[in-house]
Design a protein with these regions (language model features):
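Bacterial N-terminal signal peptides that target proteins for export
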Residues: 1-10
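Bacterial N-terminal signal peptides
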Residues: 9-19
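Sec/Tat signal peptide C-region and signal peptidase I cleavage site
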Residues: 19-25
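Acidic/polar low-complexity flexible segments
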Residues: 25-29, 99-116, 173-261
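Short N-terminal segments immediately surrounding and downstream of signal-peptide cleavage
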Residues: 25-40
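Surface-exposed, glycine/proline- and aromatic-rich loop segments on solvent-exposed faces
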Residues: 26-27, 43-129, 255-260
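Short helix-loop boundary/capping segments
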Residues: 125, 131-200
Length: 261
């Protein structure tokens, strides 16, 4: 009888552990219709940039064995007008993670954002329709001091309204408890011909163009960001507020905060 009770206890403990592992997921909902950056950004004029394409509606992070799966929903059906072959073309998503003390206060090249004290990021996962080799190569060239903390899925795919990719948990460090980490998600646009220092990101100018967002500044003092996660204590309009000098220099940069459940 004692052996039977011991076996039952072990079985129950195993089931509880499995349940805990399966429960390691976190979901963030984001308001619809806020894909305007700090409030006044405008989509490019080309028809490939459909309304809602850059509007984050939900972000889900799930621990699946030794992998972390990232899924981002947008407010428009995904299309592949540029023939990227992965179910989407125009979006590019940066998922910043805080799972350790300290971290990086500067965003990645081309985003023109910083992170507030105490909200510095430790790792970032990039969901791009570009091949992994292209994204990693650009990161090595344009963000050499940060590349060790950049992860890119082997394959990122889009289906219906969801863009999804997975990376090994070992690349993200921390304790592996994805539901306990803090996150910030930036929606940008896949740019195959980026500016010299930009990490495959599309610029925001004063006036929109065929392949340029409008409503910002022709300098690099404005955040090149269409949407981010927000919470009651971290409003998008406040985080993306910025001030430019007369020559397009940054006086007050957009400063992001991490969001945690």
């Amino acid at each position: 009888m004692k052996n039977n009770k011991t076996a039952l206890a072990i079985c129950l403990a195993s089931l509880l552990a499995l349940g805990t592992s399966a429960a390691q997921a976190v979901v963030f909902d984001d308001p619809k219709g806020d894909d305007k950056g700090p409030g006044n950004y405008i989509y490019p004029t080309d028809s490939v940039y459909k309304a809602g394409s850059f509007d984050i509606t939900k972000v889900a992070i799930t621990k699946n064995g030794d992998q972390a799966e990232f899924a981002v929903d947008v407010n428009s059906s995904l299309e592949d007008p540029w023939g990227m072959g992965v179910g989407f073309s125009v979006q590019m998503i940066f998922i910043f993670i805080k799972n350790a003390p300290d971290g990086h206060a500067d965003g990645l090249p081309g985003l023109n954002v910083k992170f507030a004290p105490g909200h510095e990021w430790n790792k970032v996962v990039i969901l791009s329709p570009q091949k992994k080799a292209r994204v990693v190569g650009e990161a090595q060239t344009k963000a050499p001091k940060l590349v060790a903390d950049i992860s890119v899925p082997n394959t990122t795919r889009g289906n219906n309204r969801t863009i999804k990719g997975s990376v090994p948990l070992s690349e993200l460090g921390g304790d592996g408890n994805v539901d306990a980490w803090a996150y910030q998600v930036i929606m940008q646009s896949n740019e195959g011909f980026p500016a010299a220092g930009d990490l495959l990101t599309r610029k925001v100018n004063e006036y929109e163009g065929q392949h340029r967002f409008g409503g910002g500044n022709d300098g690099d003092c404005d955040p090149h960001v269409m949407d981010v996660l927000e919470s009651a204590d971290a409003k998008q309009s406040e985080m993306l507020a910025y001030t430019c000098g007369p020559n397009g220099e940054s006086v007050k940069p957009a400063t992001l905060k991490m969001i945690k459940k």
